[in-house]
């Protein structure tokens, strides 16, 4: 194969290094546990946001289905005292009409919360359990004494 100009060659010891088997197993368990905790928190947040925002539509649908004579024929006091079948039909129609816009609003607010809390950054890829990352050696910075000026080490100076 011909060398491609500008292509970087893999230098031995430059990339991630495989972990020991026991270390790999322990890290895999920890990574899985952390990802499950983040997923559980995501699910809890989703249920909380959807439950809060969709509550009016779900309440209307619940009372409409519970009290309408075509469905359950409940004789509970809230059903018989306040509305008749046309009122419960109106509750059903209004609940279904409100469901889609409130669902869009709830999902948009959940997405905004996830972005603000940066929940996707909490998920750890499984490759972290298999490989150790080597840190690139950082050049040591020499501190100048308070009375002297620091001399730039390279030929370029950014102003």
Curated annotation (Swiss-Prot):
Cited InterPro entries: TMEM88
Role, per record: Inhibits the Wnt/beta-catenin signaling pathway. Crucial for heart development and acts downstream of GATA factors in the pre-cardiac mesoderm to specify lineage commitment of cardiomyocyte development.
Keyword Cell membrane tagged: yes
GO MF annotations in UniProt: PDZ domain binding
Transmembrane residue ranges: 43-63, 88-108
Record keywords, A-Z: Cell membrane, Developmental protein, Membrane, Transmembrane, Transmembrane helix, Wnt signaling pathway
Domain of life of the source: Eukaryota
Membrane topology classification: Multi-pass membrane protein
Residue numbers spanned by region Disordered: 137-159
Protein name in UniProt: Transmembrane protein 88
Subunit details: Interacts (via C-terminus) with DVL1.
Subcellular locations according to the entry: Cell membrane
Native species: Homo sapiens (Human)
Gene of this entry: TMEM88
DNA-binding found in the keyword field: no
GO biological process, alphabetically ordered: negative regulation of canonical Wnt signaling pathway; protein localization to plasma membrane; protein stabilization; Wnt signaling pathway
PANTHER family for this protein: TRANSMEMBRANE PROTEIN 88, TRANSMEMBRANE PROTEIN 88-RELATED
Family: Belongs to the TMEM88 family.
GO cellular component terms, semicolon-separated: cytosol; plasma membrane
């Amino acid at each position: 194969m011909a060398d491609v100009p500008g292509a970087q060659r893999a230098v031995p010891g430059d990339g991630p290094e495989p972990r020991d088997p026991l270390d790999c197993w322990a890290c895999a368990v920890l990574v899985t546990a952390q990802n499950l905790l983040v997923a559980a928190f995501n699910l809890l947040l989703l249920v909380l946001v959807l439950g809060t925002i969709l509550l009016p539509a779900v309440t209307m649908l619940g009372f409409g289905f519970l009290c309408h004579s075509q469905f359950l024929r409940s004789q509970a006091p809230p059903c018989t005292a306040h509305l008749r079948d046309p009122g419960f039909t109106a509750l059903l129609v209004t609940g279904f009409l409100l469901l889609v816009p409130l669902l869009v609003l709830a999902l948009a607010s959940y997405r905004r919360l996830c972005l603000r809390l940066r929940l996707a950054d909490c998920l750890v890829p499984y490759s972290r359990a298999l490989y150790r990352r080597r840190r690139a050696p950082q050049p040591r910075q020499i501190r100048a004494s308070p009375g002297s000026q620091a001399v730039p080490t390279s030929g370029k100076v950014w102003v």
